[in-house]
Amino acid sequence: LIQSVSKAVQYMAKRRIGALIVFEKETGLQDYIETGIPMDSKISQELLTNVFIPNTPLHDGAMIIQGTKIAAAASYLPLSD
């Protein structure tokens, strides 16, 4: 899991591709997951990278990871104060 995410982030950083990835911990994120596109997908470097390629349908918004799966992509998160 960590290796796939790390490799994807390094790949995107070199190409200046932005990505917002959120890992669910103690605070549930179900309300935010429901604002995005459900994925329920295994995590891979290729999938993470492909989601955030500019001008693709899922690249806007956040990817939310629950446990060892991608729960949703293109999710809306609240703005900070």
Go through the PLM ranges and name each one:
Residues L1-D81:
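Divalent-cation
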